[in-house]
Each structure stands twice: as structure tokens, then as C-alpha cells.
Amino acid sequence: MISSFRAQCAARVVREGGVIAYPTEAVWGLGCDPWNEDAVYRLLALKARPVEKGLIVVAANIHQLDFLLEDLPDVWLDRLAGTWPGPNTWLVPHQERLPEWVTGVHDSVAVRVTDHPLVQELCHLTGPLISTSANPAGRPAARTRLRVEQYFHDELDAILGGALGGRRNPSLIRDLVTGQVIRPA
């Protein structure tokens, strides 16, 4: 896979501990390396989001999430594989394989395999990323690059330009264990 220069630049920022904005399937997102504590706390501060709530981790393909999925029952893995890639976020038992600054106070973590080509490209370069809507708490999610810039001014380390994926609503969130819909699409 030949990566675009802009995706390579954004990936370098992520690897160096930066926080970026990028287009997703429905809204602009903020992202960083989920294993970089300083970057995650900076992202949370930008959003004014409590760490206890937890965050979504997005990946380019299901194999990038193997570390979370390897011990899950086959029926659950089939459920995931049948909905990915796509706008389906699942709450998956994290089994303490991700840090608390990602999972919050929960026994599960929200994960998604994206079908957005630019986000896939970025995740191929960085590995899984934090993916949370680009907006301060209580404000509407950004649907344009201009809105991202208005919300965060020069507080981001990079903005990866590109088009949204065409969906009107953020991803559906379901609990993998119970099947319960947590957030409808």
C-alpha cells in the first residue's frame, strides 16, 4: 500500500505523541496513540471529556485488534466480522489489555474497524487510534474542517484534510456480550 504524503505526515505526528483531527464516516474526529498517556489526556482536555467515560479505538482491519479479541468466543468473533469494516462500534471486554485512560471505569472498550479509506490508511501507518468526535463537550460534532478549526484553533498538532464518509449519523454502538444497542445509528 502506497500511503499519501498527508497521511504519512499525520501518522508521524501521532507517533510523536500529537493529537490530530481527521474526517471519519459521519463527523470529524480527534485522534492520538491510545498507548500514549500524555496524548490521550491532552485530547480529553481539548474536549473537556472526563477520563472515566472511556474512548473509542478505531482500526484499519480486525487483525489490528487481535490483542483484544484473541480469547473471545467464536460466536462473538463472527458477530464482529459480520459487521466490519463499517459504522459499527462494539463494546468488547478489554481484559485489562488497554490502559485505563482509554477504557475509563468500564470493563469493556469501544472498538470499530473503519471503512473510511483515509482513516484506514492512517491506521495502517499508526496502528489503532483513539477516535472521538471533534467537539468540546456539549457542542455539536464538527462536520467541516472549518468547524474543527473554530473549536480548537491552534491546539491540534495536525489536521488531516479529506472528505467525510457520507453517513449522516455517528456509528451504532452495541455491547458485544449482551447485543444491547447503546447508541442507535
Swiss-Prot record:
Enzyme type, top EC level: transferase
Source superkingdom: Bacteria
PROSITE patterns referenced in this protein's UniProt entry, alphabetically: YRDC (PS51163)
Molecular function per GO: ATP binding; double-stranded RNA binding; L-threonylcarbamoyladenylate synthase; nucleotidyltransferase activity; tRNA binding
EC number(s) given by UniProt: 2.7.7.87
Enzymatic reactions: L-threonine + hydrogencarbonate + ATP = L-threonylcarbamoyladenylate + diphosphate + H2O
Annotated GO CC locations: cytoplasm
InterPro entries membership: DHBP_synth_RibB-like_a/b_dom, Sua5-like_dom, TC-AMP_synthase, TC-AMP_synthase_SUA5
Coiled-coil blocks: none
Main localisation: cytoplasm
Entry's Gene Ontology BP terms: regulation of translational fidelity; tRNA threonylcarbamoyladenosine modification
Keyword Cytoplasm: yes
Family to which the UniProt record says this protein belongs: Belongs to the SUA5 family. TsaC subfamily.
Name of the protein in question: Threonylcarbamoyl-AMP synthase
Organism: Pseudomonas aeruginosa (strain ATCC 15692 / DSM 22644 / CIP 104116 / JCM 14847 / LMG 12228 / 1C / PRS 101 / PAO1)
